[in-house]
Amino acid sequence: MAEGVVLFGVHKLWELLNRESARLNGIGEQVDGLKRQLGRLQSLLKDADAKKHESERVRNFLEDVRDIVYDAEDIIESFLLNEFRAKEKGIKKHARRLACFLVDRRKFDSDIKGITKKISEVIGGMKSLGIQEIIDGASSMSLQERQREQKEIRQTFANSSESDLVGVEQSVEALAGHLVENDNIQVVSISGMGGIGKTTLARQVFHHDMVQRHFDGFAWVFVSQQFAQKHVWQRIWQELQPQNGDISHMDEHILQGKLFKLLETGRYLVVLDDVWKEEDWDRIKAVFPRKRGWKMLLTSRNEGVGIHADPKSFGFKTRILTPEESWKLCEKIVFHRRDETGTLSEVRVDEDMEAMGKEMVTCCGGLPLAVKVLGGLLATKHTVPEWKRVYDNIGPHLAGRSSLDDNLNSIYRVLSLSYEDLPMCLKHCFLYLAHFPEYYEIHVKRLFNYLAAEGIITSSDDGTTIQDKGEDYLEELARRNMITIDKNYMFLRKKHCQMHDMMREVCLSKAKEENFLEIFKVSTATSAINARSLSKSSRLSVHGGNALQSLGQTINKKVRSLLYFAFEDEFCILESTTPCFRSLPLLRVLDLSRVKFEGGKLPSSIGDLIHLRFLSLHRAWISHLPSSLRNLKLLLYLNLGFNGMVHVPNVLKEMQELRYLQLPMSMHDKTKLELSDLVNLESLMNFSTKYASVMDLLHMTKLRELSLFITDGSSDTLSSSLGQLRSLEVLHLYDRQEPRVAYHGGEIVLNCIHLKELELAIHMPRFPDQYLFHPHLSHIYLWCCSMEEDPIPILERLLHLKSVILTFGAFVGRRMVCSKGGFPQLCFLKLEELEELEEWIVEEGSMPLLRALTICNCRKLKLPGGINYITSLKELTIVGMKWKEKLVPGGEDYYKVQNIPNVQFINCDE
C-alpha cells in the first residue's frame, strides 16, 4: 500500500525539524523528544492508512494526527519568525531583548511539550486498536531521497491516446465522410456514456486528412455542465479568428453578430465537446446560421442533443469495447515500452500476467478510459507478485456484476486503485487538481507554484528546480493515464493539463475522504459561504460569486490555502474593511486573481498572514499596496500582474525567499524598487529599468526566466548584468526607449550559456552570428527588430531550434532564403507582418521536421516556391494573403499544398 496523505505531513514536519535544527539550538531536548515520537508515529501510519476504510476510530486518529502536525508546523514557524523579526528590529536595550527571548523560548518549550504529549496519546490510542508498527526503513528516508528513488525506478511506456485506439477505424472514416460529403446535414453527433471514448473518437475525426482539407477553419470547445454562453462564443471566435486579439471585453450582442456573419461566409468545423442537455444547445445556437458551409461535430452523453440541434443530423452511438478489444488496448499500454531513443519495443507477456490481466480488464466495463488507467497502473508493476496484489484488490469486483450500478462500481474501483497506488508526493499532486473547476485548463506553472508553496514539491541541492520536479510528477500521472497534458511543440514547457470527468470524480471523492479540500460552487455573485462548513477542511476552493467577503464571519485556523476562481467576466468585490485575512491567520496559499478591492486598496491586514508562501493578485483591481507586505518574509511566489497603475512601496526587498516575482506593468513614476537582495529568484517578470536598477540583476544568479523592459539609457550596463546570469534559460527583452537605440544582440546573449528561449523586441539592424548563442537554443521570437539583413542564414545554423517567430517588422528586407540542410530540428515557423518581404525561397532539404507554418499579413510576399518540398508539414495557416484561389483544389498552385493535411485560410477573401 502506498503511503497516505497524513504520513506525508509527518514527513514534512520531520524535514522542517532537521532543516531548522541549528536555529532551534538551545531547546534541543524538547525538539529531540518530538522527533522520537514522530519516528514512532511514522511506523504506525502505514498500517493505519491501510485500515482507515475499516474503522471510523482509525480515521479519527488520522485526522487528529493531521491537526497535530499542522499545529506543530505553525508553532515552529511562528517562533522562528518572531526571532528573526526581533533581530531585525535591533532592540537596543539588552535586558529587554533578553526578556523577550526568554519569554518566547519558555512558550515554545511549553508548546512543543504539548505537541509531544498529544502524539503520545494518539500512539497509545492507535495501539489499542491493534495498529501495528511497520518498520521498513522508508519512514526514515528524506523526501529528497524518496523522490530520487521514485525517479530512478520510473519506466517509460507507450501512452498516446491517439495511438491506443482500438476498434474505431471504420467509425472514424464514416464520421469524416458525413462531415465532408453529406450536404444535407449540419450536425454530426457522437453519443455514449462517460469514459467510453467520445472525445478521443471526435479528435480522430477532427484530425482526419479529408476533414482538415475540406474546411477553412476549425474550433474546438469544451462545454461544461455550468458553462457561460458568452465564453463558448468567445472560444469559437478565438479559434476561428486567432489573429484578432483579445475579445474578453466585447459586448455579447456584438460578438454574436460577428460570429453569425463569420459562419455565413466560409466552411468552418466547430466541435462542441460534452454538451449535456438539449437546453444547452438552445443557449448556444444563436450564432449558427440556418444552413451554410459550417458543420458541427457534437459529443454528448445524451443521444437526443444531436437530434435536437439538427433533426436531420447523423447520430453515432459509441459502443463499449469487447473483452478482447479491452485486453488488446491494455496490452498496448503495458507491454509496449519505449527505449531512450523513443523506439517502441514489445515486452514478452508472462502467461500468469496475461491471465490475470484478461480477468482484470473485465472490471473496466469496456470503457477505454478505465482500461487505459488500469494499463497505466499495471505498467508500473514488473513482477507476477506485484500483479497479484493488484488482482487481489480488484478481486471482489470480478464476479457477481449483473447491473449497470455493479459495472460502474467496478469501474470506479479500478480508477480508485490508480490513486491508491501512487507514492505519497504524487497523491498530494493529484489531489491538488481537485481545486480546479470542471473542464478547467490547468496552467502547469501555476500548479507547480501552489505545490511548492505547500511543500509538496521542493527544489534539490543537485540543481533540480521546482518546475523540473513538477514536470516529473505530471509526466508520471500522465503515464498512468490519470491526466492528459497539452504539449505545445512551439515551447519548451508543458502548458496545460486536464482530467477526464470520471477521473475528476475520483479525485473529488478522495479529496473529501482525506478532508483535503472543501469546494464551494457559488451560483450567483450574492451567494455566500456557510462558515460552519469550514470546520474540517485545510484547503478552500471558491468557484465564483462574492463569497470571499463572508469568510470573515469565522476564524478557522485549519485553513492553509484559499483559491478563488472567478466566473467569466466577473470580479469578486472585497471591502477594504474585510476581516477575511485576520480570520485565516495560518494561510500558506492565497490566490485572489481577478478580485476587485473596494477603493483599489489591498487591506493592510494582508501583513498578518505571516505564513504565506504564495500570493497571487493577478488581474486584481488594485491601485495601492500597503507597506505591511514587508511582513511576508516566507513568500516564495508573488504575482502583482495588476490592471492599471499601482503604487508599490519599496518593501519587496524584504521577501528574500522569493522564487517567483511578477511586477506590475505600470507603477507610479516616482517608484524606485531595490531588488538586489532577492538572491533566490528563479523567475522575474516585468522588470523595468524605469522602476529598478538593472544592476540589481547582478545578484540574482539563480534566475532561470527573465522578462525585462528597457526604458532609459541603461543599455550599456545590460550586457554585463545579464552576463552574470549563468543559469538563465528564458529571456524576454523589450526596448521602450524613445528614440530607439540600436543594439548588437550578440553582446546581450553572449554569456547566457544555458539560454533555451529568447524573445527580442529591440532595434537590431543585423542578427548576431550563431557562435554567440548557446548551441541548445530552442525557441526564438523576434519582433520590431528592423533587421536589414536576412537573419535566416544565421538562424538556420542553430541546430536545435524548434520554433522561430518573425513578426511586426522583425525583418525589413525584401528577400529571405532557407537553404538545404538548414533548420534540422525546426517544428514551427511563423512569418507575420513583414511588410517589405517580397520573396521567400525554400530550397529542397530545408526544414525537414517542420510541422506547422503560419504566414500572416505579409502583403507583398509572393507565393513561396518550395513549400511542397517540406514533406513533414502538417499544418499551414494563411492569414490575410491573396493566395486562396491558387491553393484550393483546382488552383494552379494546389500541387504545392495537396499533401498538407490541414490548410487554413483566414481573412483571405478580401
Curated annotation (Swiss-Prot):
**Domain of life here?**
Eukaryota
The residue intervals holding the LRR repeats read: 584-609, 610-632, 634-655
Task: Read off the Pfam families from this record.
Answer: LRR_14, NB-ARC, Rx_N, WH_DRP
What's an example Gene Ontology biological process for this entry? response to other organism
Q: Which residues form a coiled coil?
A: 22-60
Q: Which InterPro entries match?
A: Apaf_helical, Disease_R_plants, LRR_dom_sf, LRR_R13L4/SHOC2-like, NB-ARC, P-loop_NTPase, RX-like_CC, Rx_N
Locate the NB-ARC domain: which residues?
169-461
**Keywords of this protein's UniProt record, alphabetized?**
ATP-binding, Coiled coil, Leucine-rich repeat, Nucleotide-binding, Plant defense, Repeat
Statement: the UniProt record of this protein carries the keyword Repeat: yes
Q: Which GO terms describe its molecular function?
A: ADP binding; ATP binding
Q: Which family does it belong to?
A: Belongs to the disease resistance NB-LRR family. RPP8/HRT subfamily.
Protein name as annotated: Inactive disease susceptibility protein LOV1
Which organism's genome codes for this protein? Arabidopsis thaliana (Mouse-ear cress)
State the organism's lineage: Eukaryota, Viridiplantae, Streptophyta, Embryophyta, Tracheophyta
